């Protein structure tokens, strides 16, 4: 369980260590949200692509992606069914409507995960800001104390 620490009682090296730890946590949470957004965008694009599957497009020619930059010509034969990558190399055949529902559920799940992470990220940012302000105060106190001691010696 996390222990509560009063940052006013910490010295500068301890505050620096705490700031570094908070930097790492903020970076991790920011990266996590960015990765979730990338995956969510892929699901949104996949869901949007299903709109091409209409009866009047059956038999039309199209370009089938082999990689992100290489395509081959193809024909759209079945507009009712699609294969969906469900992870780890497994594909499931679904109707276009079921596929839309699948992608909507995935998008909603990722949105909820990002909403769970966002408050933690904001809290870490606020904690980091408080630590930086305390560090600034401690440095100012040390500077003032050093100047006062130098004046007293003179």
From Swiss-Prot:
Molecular-function annotations in GO: amyloid-beta binding; unfolded protein binding
Its cellular-component GO annotations read: cytoplasm; cytosol; intermediate filament cytoskeleton; nucleus; prefoldin complex
**Can the keyword Acetylation be found in this entry's annotation?**
yes
Q: Which organism is it from?
A: Bos taurus (Bovine)
How is the subunit organization of this protein annotated in UniProt? Answer: Heterohexamer of two PFD-alpha type and four PFD-beta type subunits.
Say where the protein is mainly found. Answer: nucleus
The name this protein goes by in its record: Prefoldin subunit 5
Q: Which Gene3D superfamilies match?
A: 1.10.287.370
Q: Which domain of life is it from?
A: Eukaryota
Q: Which InterPro entries match?
A: PFD_alpha_archaea (IPR011599), Prefoldin (IPR009053), Prefoldin_subunit_alpha (IPR004127)
């Amino acid at each position: 369980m996390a222990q509560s620490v009063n940052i006013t009682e910490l010295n500068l090296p301890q505050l620096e260590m705490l700031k570094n730890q908070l930097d790492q946590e903020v970076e991790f949470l920011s990266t996590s949200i960015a990765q979730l957004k990338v995956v969510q965008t892929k699901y949104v694009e996949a869901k949007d692509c299903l709109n091409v599957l209409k009866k009047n497009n059956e038999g039309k020619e199209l370009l089938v992606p082999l990689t992100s930059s290489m395509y081959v010509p193809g024909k759209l034969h079945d507009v009712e069914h699609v294969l969906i990558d469900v992870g780890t190399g497994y594909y499931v055949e679904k109707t276009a409507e079921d596929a839309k529902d699948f992608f909507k559920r995935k998008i909603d799940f990722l949105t909820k995960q990002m909403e769970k992470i966002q408050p933690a990220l904001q809290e870490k940012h606020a904690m980091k800001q408080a630590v930086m302000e305390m560090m600034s105060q401690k440095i100012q106190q040390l500077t003032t104390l050093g100047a006062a001691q130098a004046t007293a010696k003179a």
